[in-house]
Amino acid sequence: MPSHPLTLVTVLGSATPPGRLRTAVAGATERAAAQDGVEARLIDLAEHRIAPADGRPPEQLGDDTGAVIDALAAADAVVLATPVYRGSMTGVLKNLLDHVPVEALEGTPVGIVAMGATDHHFLGAERHLRDVLAFFGALTAPVAVYLSSRDFADGRPSEAAAAQLDELAATLLGLAR
């Protein structure tokens, strides 16, 4: 067991104003951070300026790209959360991942959370993210969380949805130990 606190970083890959997905993953991140021996933080890409991936190293970009990459590289476990856009992950999340060096996620436990308006999109983002995470050599959690409109009431996640998110975090932290 590591002598330092385990670090869980959740990346919310949405460029739109905060909504249900942010509420759900922020709550799960806060609950993970409340555990002994766990530090957790949410990186909302809507709040960070990430340059277009054009081959330049992060230190030449003059924005938030390098700091976000450093946070991912230092994490013991990562959650990637994305709304489903056009049957896949968002462009802002893919753009960030295009900046990340392979060694930053190699061997790191990574979980996938996707959200779509209906259940018809449940595999799109997950399938594409699994392909990208395989490229990195990440230790991808075997079960992803998919949320849709039915998982929320009054903008808040249902108990079942919150439990799925908490179980994903527990799985990732267990793998990181």
Residue ranges and their predicted role:
Residues P17-P18, R86, T118-H121, D154:
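Alpha-helix N-cap/loop-to-helix initiation residues
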Residues R41-P52, V102, A134-A153:
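Mobile beta-alpha loop/short-helix "lid" or hinge segments that flank ligand
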Residues L61-D64, A125, P157:
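Residue-level signature of the cytosolic catalytic core of signaling kinases
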Residues N95-V102, R130-A134:
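A glycine- and small-aliphatic-rich helix-loop capping segment at beta-alpha/alpha-beta transitions
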Residues V110-S148, A160:
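Short, glycine-/small-residue-rich phosphate/pyrophosphate-handling segment
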Residues L147-R177:
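Hydrophobic secondary-structure block in the mid-to-C-terminal portion of proteins
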